[in-house]
From Swiss-Prot:
<keyword id="KW-0472">Membrane</keyword>
<dbReference type="InterPro" id="IPR003593">
    <property type="entry name" value="AAA+_ATPase"/>
</dbReference>
<dbReference type="InterPro" id="IPR017871">
    <property type="entry name" value="ABC_transporter-like_CS"/>
</dbReference>
<dbReference type="InterPro" id="IPR027417">
    <property type="entry name" value="P-loop_NTPase"/>
</dbReference>
<dbReference type="InterPro" id="IPR050107">
    <property type="entry name" value="ABC_carbohydrate_import_ATPase"/>
</dbReference>
<dbReference type="GO" id="GO:0005886">
    <property type="term" value="C:plasma membrane"/>
</dbReference>
<keyword id="KW-0813">Transport</keyword>
<protein>
    <recommendedName>
        <fullName>Putative ribose/galactose/methyl galactoside import ATP-binding protein 1</fullName>
        <ecNumber>7.5.2.11</ecNumber>
        <ecNumber>7.5.2.7</ecNumber>
    </recommendedName>
</protein>
<dbReference type="Pfam" id="PF00005">
    <property type="entry name" value="ABC_tran"/>
</dbReference>
<feature type="binding site">
    <location>
        <begin position="46"/>
        <end position="53"/>
    </location>
    <ligand>
        <name>ATP</name>
    </ligand>
</feature>
<keyword id="KW-1278">Translocase</keyword>
<comment type="function">
    <text>Part of an ABC transporter complex involved in carbohydrate import. Could be involved in ribose, galactose and/or methyl galactoside import. Responsible for energy coupling to the transport system.</text>
</comment>
<comment type="similarity">
    <text>Belongs to the ABC transporter superfamily. Carbohydrate importer 2 (CUT2) (TC 3.A.1.2) family.</text>
</comment>
<dbReference type="InterPro" id="IPR003439">
    <property type="entry name" value="ABC_transporter-like_ATP-bd"/>
</dbReference>
<keyword id="KW-0547">Nucleotide-binding</keyword>
<dbReference type="GO" id="GO:0005524">
    <property type="term" value="F:ATP binding"/>
</dbReference>
<dbReference type="GO" id="GO:0016887">
    <property type="term" value="F:ATP hydrolysis activity"/>
</dbReference>
C-alpha cells in the first residue's frame, strides 16, 4: 500500500519511496514509503524495532539507503551525510538531546558557525546573542541566549534544539519522542511552537507512542512493522485500536506454551511504592518463586529504571523492598547480591560482562572469594572445574574456559552472565532484554534456559520490548507507561493489542 496522497497541486516536501537498508545479516528496512507535506505534522508509529529510527536516520543523512529514492520538492536528492541533510533544510531532534551544558544557549545554537568580528578571529558575542534572540522571537519564546544550557530544564533544552534546527533554515523537522521528559504545561508549550512552525510551512515528522498526543497534533500517521511499510492514513479517520492492530499485526510467529500456575508459590520479592523522580512513580509488584514476570512497555516507560533501582544501581526517593517476607535495605548492587538478587543488563558488553577476560573469570566475577585459599592464593583448578561445570550445564559453546569472552556469540555471552549469577546463588533474577542482539536459534536456547530456571524455583523478572517474546515467556505481565504500572495481565488473557493499550495509557488498569 502506497502513502495516502490527497490530491494536491504541489509535490510533497519530502517523499521516500521503496527505501531499503541492510546491515550485516539483517534486512532493517524493506520497500518503505513515507512522504511529508509542507505545513503538516506526520506521525510515524510502530513498535520498538519497527524501523522508524532507521528510516529517519536515512532522511537525516546518518545512514545511507541501499534501495529506493528520496525526492524533495519533486526532485531526486542524495543525502550523503548529516551536513547534506542540513543543507537541504532537514533537521532532527533526538530523544537524547545533543547539547553542551557548559556553553550558553546561543553558543549551542551556532556552534561551529559563530559570527566573527572584523578580522575573522574572535567570536562576535553581541551578534551571536542577537541572532539567537531573533530565532526565539520567531518562536515566541522568552529565553536569554546568554544562559548556560546546563541551567535549563529539559523542556527549555528541547526548545534550544528546535532553535538550532531553525538556525539552518530547516523546512523539515524530525522529532523523536519529544514529550518523553515533559510535563503537561511543557507539552502545551511545545505544541504551540509546533503549531507556529506548521503555520509557517515547516513539515514535521513526529515519532511518538502516545496516542492522546497524536490525536491533538498529527494530520496523518504512517505505521511501520518489522522494517516494512504498513499504511498511511489521515489521523482524523482512524482509531487507536486500528493503529494498534496495524502496529502489532495478526501473526505471531512464536512458539507458545501454557505457563504453570505459580499463584500458590511463596513470594520471593515484593516491591511497594517505589519512586524516583519522574522515572519511577509509585511502582509496586510481587514476584513468586518459580514465576516469570514479564515487564512490557514502550521505550522510556521505566522498566529498566525499576530493575536498576531494585538492584541498587540507582538511588530511589521512596519505596520498600521485601525479600522472602523481610524488609531489606538495598543501597548498592553489593547489597542486592547479598540478598540473592542478580541483574542481567540490557547492555551486557558494558555492564555484566568483561569482554577482555576469559570465560572462567567472567563466570567467577562476582564469586571470586570462594576460590581464594588462605586469603592469598587462587585455586585455579577449582575455578576451572566450576566454570566447566556451568559451561556444560548451560551449553555454552566455547573451545575452552580460557577463551576470551569477546570471541563468543551474543547468545553464549548471555549464558556466561547467567552462569555468573547462578554461581553467586542468586534466586531472584532480573533479565533486561535477554535476547537482544542474538539470533533466532540462540533465542530459543535462552527461552529454554529461563523456563528451566523457573522450574527450579528461581524468581524471574523479564524485561522485553518484543511483544511475542513477552507473551511466549511470561506467567504474568506487568505493563508500564511513563514510569507507572498501568496494568497487569494474566498470561492466559494477554494479547499484543491489550499490552499496547496499556502501554499507551496513563492510568492503571487490570485487564482480563
Amino acid at each position: 500500500m502506497q502513502p495516502d496522497l490527497t490530491p494536491n497541486p504541489a509535490p510533497p516536501l519530502i517523499a521516500l519511496t521503496g527505501i531499503g537498508k541492510r546491515f550485516p545479516g539483517v534486512q532493517a528496512l524493506d520497500d518503505c514509503h513515507f512522504d511529508l507535506r509542507a505545513g503538516e505534522v506526520h506521525a510515524l508509529m510502530g513498535e520498538n524495532g519497527a524501523g522508524k529510527s532507521t528510516l529517519m536516520k536515512i532522511l537525516a543523512g546518518v545512514y545511507q539507503r541501499d534501495d529506493g529514492e528520496i525526492r524533495m520538492d519533486g526532485r531526486a536528492v542524495e543525502i550523503a551525510d548529516p551536513r547534506a541533510a542540513q543543507a537541504l533544510g532537514i533537521g532532527i531532534i533526538h530523544q537524547e538531546l545533543n547539547l553542551m551544558n557548559h556553553l550558553s544557549v546561543a553558543q549551542n545554537i551556532f556552534i561551529g558557525r559563530e559570527p566573527r568580528g572584523r578580522f575573522g578571529v574572535f567570536v562576535d558575542e553581541a551578534a551571536l546573542n542577537r541572532d539567537a534572540a531573533a530565532i526565539f522571537a520567531r518562536m515566541r519564546l522568552d529565553l536569554d541566549p546568554r544562559t548556560p544550557v546546563g541551567q535549563l530544564t529539559v523542556a527549555k533544552q528541547q526548545m534550544v534544539e528546535i532553535a538550532k534546527a531553525l538556525s539552518f533554515d530547516s523546512r523539515v523537522l524530525i522529532m523523536d519522542e519529544p514529550t518523553a521528559a515533559l510535563n503537561n504545561a511543557e507539552i502545551a508549550e511545545l505544541f504551540r511552537i509546533i503549531g507556529d512552525l506548521r503555520a509557517h510551512g515547516v513539515g514535521i515528522v513526529y515519532i511518538s507512542h502516545k496516542m492522546d498526543e497524536l490525536r491533538q497534533i498529527a494530520d496523518r500517521v504512517t505505521v511501520m512493522r518489522d522494517g516494512k511499510y504498513v499504511a498511511t492514513v489521515p489521523m482524523a479517520d482512524t482509531s487507536m485500536d486500528a493503529i494498534i492492530a496495524m502496529m502489532v499485526g495478526r501473526q505471531l510467529a512464536t512458539e507458545f506454551r501454557t505457563p504453570p500456575d505459580t499463584s500458590a508459590n511463596d513470594v520471593a520479592l515484593e516491591v511497594r511504592g517505589l519512586s524516583r523522580g519522574r522515572a519511577i512513580r509509585d511502582v509496586g509488584f510481587t514476584l513468586r518463586r518459580g514465576e516469570i514476570l514479564g515487564f512490557a512497555g514502550l521505550m522510556g516507560a521505566g522498566r529498566t529504571e525499576v530493575a536498576r533501582a531494585v538492584f541498587g544501581a540507582d538511588p530511589v526517593d521512596a519505596g520498600e523492598i521485601r525479600v522472602h517476607g523481610k524488609t531489606v535495605s538495598i543501597r548498592s548492587p553489593a547489597d542486592a547480591v547479598r540478598h540473592g538478587i542478580g541483574y542481567l543488563s540490557e547492555d551486557r558488553k558494558h555492564f555484566g560482562l568483561a569482554v577482555g577476560m576469559d570465560v572462567q573469570n567472567n563466570i567467577a566475577l562476582s564469586s571470586m572469594r570462594r576460590f581464594v585459599r588462605r586469603g592469598l592464593f587462587l585455586d585455579a583448578r577449582a575455578l576451572r572445574d566450576t566454570a566447566q561445570s556451568y559451561v556444560r550445564q548451560l551449553a555454552i559453546r566455547t573451545p575452552s574456559v580460557t577463551q576470551p569472552a569477546r570471541l563468543l556469540s551474543g547468545g553464549n555471552q548471555q549464558k556466561i552472565v547467567i552462569a555468573k549469577w547462578l554461581l553467586r546463588d542468586c534466586d531472584i533474577l532480573f533479565f533486561d532484554e535477554p535476547t537482544r542482539g542474538i539470533d533466532v536459534g540462540a533465542k530459543s536456547e535462552i527461552y529454554k534456559l529461563l523456563d528451566a530456571l523457573a522450574a527450579d524455583g528461581k524468581a524471574i523478572v523479564m524485561i522485553s520490548s518484543e511483544l511475542p517474546e513477552v507473551l511466549r515467556m511470561s506467567h504474568r505481565i506487568l505493563v508500564m507507561c511513563e514510569g507507572r504500572v498501568t496494568g497487569e495481565l494474566r498470561a492466559a488473557d494477554a494479547t499484543q493489542e491489550k499490552i499496547m493499550q496499556l502501554a499507551t495509557q496513563r492510568e492503571s488498569t487490570v485487564l482480563s
